């Protein structure tokens, strides 16, 4: 099981990301895409990253907006896995 990050580690890792915010025991970001089909294509690409990482975000799709939430549920909070996947997601947008 991945180790939980403390508040200082979380803030440091958040500083390395753009647009991600902490919401309790998760980090979240909303992506604005040019169209609904491009939003779906983005989610498909996120799914491939998530499968490769063995770590899956919660996904909310609202027309052209996709909100991703990351938390390591089996650890009960935020771990390095969440921030690593967030960084990978940011690379594909």
Swiss-Prot record:
It comes from the Bacteria. Keywords: Lyase. One of its GO terms (molecular function) is 4-alpha-hydroxytetrahydrobiopterin dehydratase activity. Gene3D superfamilies: Transcriptional coactivator/pterin dehydratase. InterPro entries: PCD_sf, Pterin_deHydtase. Its EC number is 4.2.1.96. It is an enzyme of class 4 (lyase). It holds the Pfam family Pterin_4a. One of its GO terms (biological process) is tetrahydrobiopterin biosynthetic process. The keyword Lyase applies. It catalyses: (4aS,6R)-4a-hydroxy-L-erythro-5,6,7,8-tetrahydrobiopterin = (6R)-L-erythro-6,7-dihydrobiopterin + H2O. The keyword Lyase applies. Belongs to the pterin-4-alpha-carbinolamine dehydratase family. PANTHER family: PTERIN-4-ALPHA-CARBINOLAMINE DEHYDRATASE (PTHR12599:SF0). This is Putative pterin-4-alpha-carbinolamine dehydratase.
């Amino acid at each position: 099981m991945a180790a939980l990050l403390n508040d200082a580690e979380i803030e440091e890792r958040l500083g390395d990301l753009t647009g991600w915010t902490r919401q309790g025991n998760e980090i979240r970001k909303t992506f604005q895409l040019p169209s609904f089909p491009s939003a779906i294509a983005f989610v498909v690409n996120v799914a491939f990253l998530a499968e490769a990482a063995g770590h899956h975000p919660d996904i909310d799709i609202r027309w052209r907006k996709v909100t991703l939430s990351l938390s390591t549920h089996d650890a009960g909070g935020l771990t390095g896995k969440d921030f690593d996947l967030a960084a990978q997601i940011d690379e594909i947008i």
